[in-house]
């Protein structure tokens, strides 16, 4: 009787141990490399696709002759400083098995071409995605919302061509910008683009919470920032895949890093950590789940002796353990879109 009782106790303990093993926290699971793995979507376990995007702003005179921003990429020292900042952040990301989606525009591209700087070509050769960041007023002027789809398309094509010249990449699919132009998706499709994200109202510096989440969709149309119906309505035949940024709970999540709301770089990355964990909770098995955030050249530099340490710390303490456990997987924006397209079939 005693022996039977012991055996039963052992069986119960083993059963509990097995059940607990299913929910071992990601940070406690054994580390394993996941660098350069193909994007997968195992129906048995939700996976969150992750990357860091980079917006290169239009600082100086653009290819269309519009003066924009503070600073000027036509000044060699200013341009080189930003080149070094971009390289520093991309190298940090590479060291953790990731690749970024680099979003460029003139005059950064034109200066790179004119000066013979190969930074975009070098980054493309190392696996980073080349894409377009389109500040419409810097390329179309102040009345951009009144212009035709063809005018938008022509200028977007011009900017894409400059990215191709600077990087050697011909397959440019992703763009950010043009957010308040109702016909932006028609213009983007005309320009050969099919992946979009980073929607923020440039006037309010906010993102409607209707746009947040982890699952991509195909918007049936654009928005003026007031009427959100077409944007939030999924069209199975829509030409563009929209990638939400994650399960954020603040409408100013995209701009708070440059405001007093976050308090500090460290506080902002603590907010990112909580948002990433919330996105993991929202992720669904068998669906494409995404989370990403954006940086700019020189942003979050912090201590000159340890530049961009807050980014490195976030990757070491938050992202790396989740990649090792299989909960998170690195993927550039077009790879996220392709993973979503694969689930549509």
Per-segment meaning from a language model:
Residues 1-45, 188, 342-345:
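Intrinsically disordered, low-complexity Ser/Thr/Pro-rich tracts
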Residues 96-182, 246-249, 290-299, 332-335, ...:
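Metal-dependent polysaccharide deacetylase catalytic core of the NodB/CE4 family, i.e.
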Residues 59-64, 139-142, 250-254, 302:
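Short acidic/His/Gly/Ser-rich catalytic and metal-binding motifs that mark active-site loops
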Residues 196-203, 207-211, 263-345:
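C-terminal domain-boundary segment and adjacent tail
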Residues 171-289:
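Active-site-adjacent pocket scaffolds in enzyme catalytic domains
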Residues 76-89, 113-117, 149-159, 265-278, ...:
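Well-ordered, non-membrane alpha-helical segments in soluble/globular domains
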Residues 39-122, 289-293, 297-300, 306, ...:
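Active-site beta->alpha N-cap acidic-glycine motif
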Residues 45-54, 122-133, 239-245:
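Short coil-to-beta-strand
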């Amino acid at each position: 009787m005693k022996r039977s009782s012991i055996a039963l106790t052992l069986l119960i303990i083993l059963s509990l141990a097995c059940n607990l093993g299913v929910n071992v926290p990601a940070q406690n699971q054994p580390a394993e490399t996941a660098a350069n793995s193909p994007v997968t979507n195992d129906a048995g376990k939700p996976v969150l696709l992750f990357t860091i995007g980079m917006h290169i702003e239009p600082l100086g005179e653009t290819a269309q002759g519009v003066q924009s921003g503070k600073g000027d990429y036509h000044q060699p020292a200013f341009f080189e400083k930003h080149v070094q900042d971009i390289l520093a952040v991309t190298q940090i990301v590479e060291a953790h098995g990731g690749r970024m989606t680099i979003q460029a525009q003139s005059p950064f591209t034109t200066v790179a071409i004119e000066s013979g700087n190969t930074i975009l070509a070098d980054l493309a050769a190392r696996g980073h995605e080349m894409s377009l960041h389109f500040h419409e007023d810097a390329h179309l002027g102040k009345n951009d919302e009144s212009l035709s789809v063809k005018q938008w398309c022509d200028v977007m094509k011009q900017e894409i061509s400059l990215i191709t010249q600077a990087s050697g990449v011909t397959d440019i699919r992703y763009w950010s910008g043009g957010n308040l132009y109702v016909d932006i998706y028609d213009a983007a499709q005309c320009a050969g683009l099919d992946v979009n994200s980073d929607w923020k109202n440039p006037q309010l510096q906010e993102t409607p919470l209707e746009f947040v989440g982890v699952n991509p969709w195909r918007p049936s149309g654009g928005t003026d920032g007031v009427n959100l119906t077409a944007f939030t309505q999924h069209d199975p035949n829509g030409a563009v895949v929209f990638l939400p940024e994650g399960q954020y709970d603040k409408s100013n999540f995209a701009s708070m890093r440059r405001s007093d709301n976050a308090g500090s770089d460290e506080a902002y990355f603590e907010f990112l950590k909580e948002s990433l964990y919330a996105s993991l909770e929202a992720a669904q098995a068998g669906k494409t789940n995404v989370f990403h955030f954006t940086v700019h050249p020189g942003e979050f530099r912090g201590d000159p002796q340890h530049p961009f340490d807050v980014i490195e710390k976030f990757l070491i303490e938050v992202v790396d353990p989740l990649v090792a456990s299989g909960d998170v997987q690195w993927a550039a924006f077009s790879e996220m879109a392709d993973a979503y397209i694969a689930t549509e079939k």
